[in-house]
């Protein structure tokens, strides 16, 4: 585990890694990342469910054929296998990403 799970520490690691995301924590099926795409979000559907918690910035979230605006502090969910991406986002966009559960996602409650 990293020293502290903070946005500041995650951004420092992103700068060093020169990547759009960095994994900061893993436990069981839980994986915590910080994600900072540049200009275009190129992610593809994932095998597991994921939750985003927007740290900064705003834009549009495309998820399973639907679009919705997003902003700081917002929580977004993308089920396993769903086509999703961030669109028209501001230059300061950063989000926490929480992957969890089994491949294929969890069954709806």
Regions found by a protein language model. Give the residues of each.
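Short acidic-glycine-tyrosine-enriched beta hairpin
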Residues: 65-80
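Short hydrophobic/aromatic-rich beta-strand segments that constitute the beta-sheet cores
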Residues: 32-34, 61-63, 95
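Short histidine-centered beta-strand/loop micro-motifs
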Residues: 22-24, 40-46, 63, 87-88, ...
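Ligand-binding loop in jelly-roll beta-barrel domains
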Residues: 80-106
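Short, charged/polar surface micro-motifs in flexible loops or helix N-caps
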Residues: 28-30, 37-40, 58-60, 101-105
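A structure-centric signal for secondary-structure junctions around beta-strands
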Residues: 29, 48, 92-93
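Short, conserved beta-strand element in jelly-roll/cupin
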Residues: 46-61
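A short, N-terminal "cap"/entry segment at the start of jelly-roll beta-barrel domains
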Residues: 1-34, 39-44
